[in-house]
């Protein structure tokens, strides 16, 4: 009887060990898959960036009275005609094309610039926003990736010193550069901004910009030197909260310069 008990214990321990090893193996495979996927994505984005950077010849032949545009949008259109802008934030890893699908709002939540599946997705806007940034608020979305890619670096603006020292967001389009001064950065709830507010109503928009300047959040930084009014054009960058998918972290800026580029 004792021998049977020992055999059962050994069998149980063996099964437990095998199960544990299988779980570890599956975990390692998943980590490897995510790592390779993210590495491929970063390489793809770097390749896209290098292929569409304006050449020295283009710069030298340009009208020097115009602002510099580092992106060759003609080359970018050959990659994907749903790319309509490029976003850059100094001192962050945020330096990406901006897309808007013609068929599905959520397509680029898990697809790259080449329209291939990618867990990290892309930086994108939805149908509720025009592609010319003329709306009272344009919302761009990006994942909060653990490797620091996509919109993960938005969380740097939680730090007051970083927030105060890095004030601008740059959006490039063909022959155009938009400069936004950052107004606020804060934790927000899970509401869909464009579906929750009727920005055509001046009263609604006024209340909204009041909240932008005075967010209802314990985690917030605000640039009190900026003034917003009914003519303001906002840019909202939205990503997940750290360790919490039931809310958003927002960095919001106001358009201060819209200039032609070569």
Language-model-derived ranges and their functions:
Residues 1-12:
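N-terminal Lys/Arg-rich, disordered targeting/topogenic segments
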Residues 2-3, 17, 22, 42, ...:
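N-terminal leader/presequence segments that precede the conserved core
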Residues 15-33:
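Sec-dependent N-terminal signal peptides of Gram-positive bacterial secreted proteins and lipoproteins
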